[in-house]
Amino acid sequence: MSEKKGEVPYLGIIINYDKDKKLDKFSIDTLRDRYLWQEESSPQEAFARAAVYASTFQEETDYAMAQRIYNYASDLWFMFSTPILSNGGTTRGLPISCFLNYVGDSIDELTDHFKENARLASSGGGIGGYWGDVRSDGTSTSSGSKSTGSIPFMKVVDSEMLAFNQGVTRRGSYAAYTDISHPEIEEFMVMRKESGGDVNRKCLNLHNGVNINNAFLRAVETDDDWRLIDPKTKEAVKIIKARELWSKILDARAETGEPYIVNLDNCNDALPQGQKNLGLEIKQSNLCSEITLPTNEERTAVCCLSSVNLEHFDDWSEDKNFIQDLITMLDNVLEHFIDNAIDMNNLGGYNANYERFKKHIKEGKEGFTKAAYSAYRERSIGLGAMGFHSYLQAHNIPFEGIYATGFNHKAFKHIKSSALKASKEIAKDRGEAPDISGSTLRNAHLLAVAPNASSSIICGGTSPSIEPISCLLYTSDAADDETSG
């Protein structure tokens, strides 16, 4: 790809063009097609650009850290999320992987949701939207007419995602979530099926997810009735057997692979205590269902991702700087996003509320107000993992064997403990996230195992995420996988 060889200075660090040999042809072709910027001729230059960008905090670059981050990436110990690799240090898009937003019930709130989606999708982020508070089909409106329900408005988002793309890397992607008790749940779970029903209420370009809870699972277990309750009137619209509804969900998943299933009771039980004390609540997951963050009328949750490569666990697990550097890197990138949207110098104070915060949004950045506020308050990041199956293969360990279970516990215990330690160290210098004041942590959320479809390709074809390699020979178009990478 590049005729340059050996070690050379580049952007204030030393890169090694010979490390291109660690990549296979598919990796290099993917990088060249989607991720190199302007005059870049080698993946090493892209890795260096992203490393320098991600080692900069409040306009001060730590070049020693940038060198280490570059070394980690070029040795395939980890990979930047594709938004960081594609957009970091450039003028195209944002380095954020995930946005989670809330959809209100009024016309103004619905149209505001469409406008926010346009901003977020065109800037590089995948979106997960919560629709459980939108009144159901047939419910009366303030004008005296009858509501058409939430699905026709999801159809607008469906078209929106086709219209707005994310540059050359991915097209706009969106996952709609609703509650298992919503009256439209039966239609919602099959809205991605091409056959059956009204074509104008089909959303073939969206993903969808169903929020369940422990009460529903108990009803399935005991074969009880389940009430479908309109979120506006709070009245039961229909009563259905819980097992019948559960069976329909499983049938839809067998046919289309979706809807995702998220148990909100489990998610909210694990919410940091500081956020519980503020009355915050998780209402949905994100585009690829790997992270759960609180959302509401004032908050569009933000998450900045990257992933370690477990294929090289034996190497990087001995490096005491590795996880510390990656958590610091993700916090830096999140700070770039916040600084891009808000005038922090004029904001004043460390613990601003939404009303004060939105007064200091920079001109032209109004579409990111809720996202920047959420990032500022909770500073959530998501360090994930890929290469699990590749590690097992390299060590002749059966995927379903006891040694695989042992490695699983060992690897993720190391990642979690190291990430918590890193977040505490960063908080000593930069302060705790306002949402979790008193926790000693910089970040309210630290880990998220993303699908890594593109990142695994870039890492020389390592196995994606924690999934097994499903077959020995296959074709792939990662741009159409719509993953956060």
Regions of interest found by a model, annotated:
Residues E3-E59, Y63-A66, V134, S143-V156, ...:
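Conserved, charged catalytic cores of large soluble enzymes
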Residues Q324-A372, Y376, S380, H395-N452, ...:
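Internal maturation/activation junctions in enzymes
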Residues T295-N296, H445, V449-C471:
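Non-catalytic terminal/interface segments that mediate subunit docking, oligomerization
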Residues K21-D29, S74-F80, L110-T111, K115-E116, ...:
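Short, hydrophobic/aliphatic alpha-helical segments
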Residues Y474-G485:
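Single conserved hydrophobic/aromatic residue that forms the stacking wall/gate
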Residues L94-S97, S123-I127, R170-A175, E184, ...:
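Short coil/turn connectors at secondary-structure junctions
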Residues W37, A51-F57, Y70-L94, F99-S142, ...:
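Function-dense linear segments that define catalytic or interfacial modules
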